[in-house]
Amino acid sequence: MIALEKLTYFYQHLPMRFDFHVKPGERIAILGPSGAGKSTLLNLVAGFLMADSGELRLNGESHRETSPAKRPVSILFQENNLFPHLTIGQNIALGLHPGLRLNAAQRATLQQIADRVGLTDLLDRLPSQVSGGQRQRAALARCLVRHQPILLLDEPFSALDPALRQEMLDLVESVCEERKFTLLMVSHNLDDAMRIAKRTVLIVDGQIYYDGPTQALQDGSADAAAILGISRSSSD
């Protein structure tokens, strides 16, 4: 589903290099210190940054040089990027048609997704008239209506309080199960990674430092857990 082979991007003349594969339907957490290259990795997959060399395949096709619109991915950022002058329903509809001219099937899709994320009664409200958690639900819904098989999450819930963050993680987990999404989720929170992904890729200085079970980072059994300030003794 996702294959990065010696994918290299030069940032201020320093190479960031990524090499790993993700199976269809697999959920991967991306962890690492601030500035390590986590968001860069997602932007390379999404097409907002173009790699200098290497190979990027999505769904078995090469996408290293294709535009974001032609890649089979949807991405959700920490900033929900909702347009303040459009209603929640219109913001979601942008995922279906940039001119908001929906046919009957698209309107049905929008309604179905709105029901799924709990926004049915809020479609006519402006973003300023709903809560932060509801705005992120709308941003997630805009991703879901696009029906792309790969979902990229770049710390979209980090600004939410713990209860709302857990609620959104539950929603993401259930939606991924239902739709068999392949997921890459950037996070600073190991507990969130444990909640979503059995496998974690740890990035340090633009390189993959660890690729393995999330549990081994949580319990300190992996040497790489020290990067996150975790040792076997501190996790006991």
Swiss-Prot record:
This enzyme's EC code(s): 7.6.2.15
Swiss-Prot/TrEMBL catalytic activity: thiamine(out) + ATP + H2O = thiamine(in) + ADP + phosphate + H(+)
GO cellular component: plasma membrane
Membrane topology term: Peripheral membrane protein
Pfam family, one: ABC_tran
Gene3D superfamilies noted in UniProt: P-loop containing nucleotide triphosphate hydrolases
Protein family membership: Belongs to the ABC transporter superfamily. Thiamine importer (TC 3.A.1.19.1) family.
Subunit composition and interactions: The complex is composed of two ATP-binding proteins (ThiQ), two transmembrane proteins (ThiP) and a solute-binding protein (ThiB).
UniProt function note: Part of the ABC transporter complex ThiBPQ involved in thiamine import. Responsible for energy coupling to the transport system.
Protein name: Thiamine import ATP-binding protein ThiQ
Organism for this UniProt entry: Pectobacterium atrosepticum (strain SCRI 1043 / ATCC BAA-672)
